[in-house]
Amino acid sequence: GMDVSRMRENELAQVRNREIGFVFQSFNLLARATARKQVMLPLQYSRNGNRVPPAERRRRAEKALSEVGLADRMEHRPSELSGGQRQRVAIARALVNDPQILMADEPTGNLDSTSGAEIMEILHRLHSEQGMTIVMVTHDQSLADQAERIIHLKDGLIVE
């Protein structure tokens, strides 16, 4: 591990960019950017200030989109995608830097049950096949029950 308590803000930003992927309930996608460009974006800010070359950004973005089942949607903009597909773009964006940890805030909260199940299947696969640590916030007990470990919070404090 690494001691982040003494790091400066720019060092913390680099750690967050390299080691942690973030997935949000509201997707946080850019309206005018294609799925491929959404996923390439984190690579422009990574690797200790050394930008990843454009061809490598493209290759890695395409790989991440393929991993979440969107190889055929790379040129689509968010308005052309379903909610489940938008969340998969967000997951691909979170994965493109090969993080050790994936932080997911209500990743199925804005989705229908079928799309939500597809997202959970992707998260399970990332954990079981790649050994990725996934920290998920949810109010849905049926999703929490799928986790190896559950930590309950109340008013910002651990209660269980």
Predicted regions located by residue number:
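ABC family nucleotide-binding domain
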Residues: 1-153
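Conserved switch/coupling elements of ABC/ABC-like ATPase nucleotide-binding domains
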Residues: 155-160
